[in-house]
């Protein structure tokens, strides 16, 4: 069965690059866009395997930052795997402290490390 990956709070161009990165890591995956809380609830109810969260959630979410949303998700969906997409080491450290898997930055998209991180998260 194909793995389900949700891109949470990303703009169109970033989503395109993330889709390419995900398809390189997991060819038969289903990638969905999550632009607000109702989309997120639907993805969680549908059994999403991995959430790739943007550092800043500009609209559509009760939380304004990805790390805040990771904390909330850990309380209500403790088994859902999350990763933060951010170039900032302090944001990555905060996400891991909140319960996320180690993420990656947008500048790393296309690198073997990103593909490995996504594959490992889906294993």
Where are these regions (language model features)?
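Conserved phosphotransfer microenvironments
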Residues: 52-73
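Conserved phosphotransfer cores of two-component systems
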Residues: 45-46, 72-79
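Alpha4 helix (beta4-alpha4-beta5 surface) of REC/receiver domains from two-component response regulators
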Residues: 64, 84-104
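The C-terminal output helix
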Residues: 119-123
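Acidic, metal-coordinating helix/loop segments flanking the phosphotransfer/catalytic sites
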Residues: 34-50, 60
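Conserved acidic segment of CheY-like receiver
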Residues: 2-22, 33, 51
């Amino acid at each position: 069965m194909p793995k389900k990956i949700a891109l949470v709070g990303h703009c169109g161009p970033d989503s395109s690059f993330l889709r390419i990165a995900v398809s390189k890591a997991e060819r038969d995956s289903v990638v969905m866009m999550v632009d607000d809380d109702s989309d997120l609830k639907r993805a969680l109810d549908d059994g999403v395997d991995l959430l790739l969260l943007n550092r800043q959630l500009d609209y559509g979410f009760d939380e304004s930052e990805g790390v805040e949303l990771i904390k909330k998700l850990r309380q209500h969906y403790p088994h859902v795997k999350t990763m933060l997409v951010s170039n900032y080491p302090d944001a990555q450290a905060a996400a891991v402290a909140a319960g996320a898997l180690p993420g990656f930055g947008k500048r790393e998209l296309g690198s073997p490390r990103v593909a490995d991180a996504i594959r490992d998260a889906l294993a």
